[in-house]
UniProtKB/Swiss-Prot annotation:
Lineage summary: Eukaryota, Viridiplantae, Streptophyta, Embryophyta, Tracheophyta
Main location: mitochondrion
Pfam families, per the entry: HSP20
InterPro entries referenced in this protein's UniProt entry, alphabetically: A-crystallin/Hsp20_dom (IPR002068), HSP14.7/HSP23.5/HSP23.6-like (IPR044656), HSP20-like_chaperone (IPR008978)
SUPFAM superfamilies for this protein: HSP20-like chaperones
Domain of life: Eukaryota
Domain sHSP residue range list: 105-211
Protein name stated in the entry: Heat shock 22 kDa protein, mitochondrial
Species of provenance: Glycine max (Soybean)
Entry GO CC: mitochondrion
Protein's cellular compartments: Mitochondrion
């Protein structure tokens, strides 16, 4: 009985690992200037919640949508801290994390050094990048994957002393306007706004006239 349970858990873990990993593609690549953002809502939210930095990376189909969003956001930035002499590649060292959000409610989740908030109009991300300037930050989208990279100047002669940051966020297809992403880098804080498509703008539902 015990050996059967172990085998099932191993198989499930392997399938999940393979489903999260996919090769990065150069096609459909978009880059965004960190000067492009014009506005950002900084209003406080009484429902801000700290996320467990060791959040699960599995997303069972039976889970509630708010639970899924909680785990996703917690995983996205779980390893994203700045420490000279180390490089952080986000969850799983290069793995992409699917971002699944509920469309009928607004959310805000935060942790040390980051904040993610969803409204009816957009997804708002704030990431602390102390020591980096806007020239050190690169934001791009490759096949619906939002990629945030930051690398500062070396401190001294050692190459490992440079501050580095990398995170990948898979955005649901046909839900966000990836060509209208806005970003602003100011005083070591990166703010990114990803506008959402309105229901009438989405083309995934086609009505067929019956004659």
């Amino acid at each position: 009985m015990a050996s059967s349970l172990i085998a099932k858990r191993f198989l499930s873990s392997s399938l999940l690992s393979r489903s999260l990993l996919r090769p990065a593609a150069s096609a459909s690549h978009r880059s965004f200037d960190t000067n492009a953002m014009r506005q950002y809502d900084n209003r406080a939210d009484d429902h801000s919640t700290d996320i467990d930095r060791h959040s699960e990376r599995s997303f069972p189909s039976t889970a509630r949508r708010d639970d899924i969003f909680l785990r996703c956001v917690g995983s996205i930035f779980s390893d994203s801290e700045f420490e000279p002499g180390s490089e952080h590649d986000g969850p799983g060292h290069g793995q992409s994390v699917p971002l699944r959000v509920a469309r009928d409610r607004s959310w805000r989740w935060s942790g040390r050094g980051w904040d993610a908030r969803e409204t009816e109009d957009a997804l708002h991300l704030r990431v602390d990048m102390p020591g980096l300037a806007k020239e050190d930050v690169k934001i791009s989208v490759e096949q619906n994957t939002l990629i945030i990279k930051g690398e500062g100047a070396k401190e001294g002669d050692e190459e490992e002393s440079a501050r580095r940051y990398t995170s990948r966020i898979d955005l649901p297809d046909k839900l966000y306007k990836i060509d209208q992403i806005r970003a602003e880098m100011k005083n070591g804080v990166l703010k990114v706004v990803v506008p959402k498509m309105k229901e009438e703008e989405r083309k995934d539902v086609i009505s067929v006239k019956v004659e």
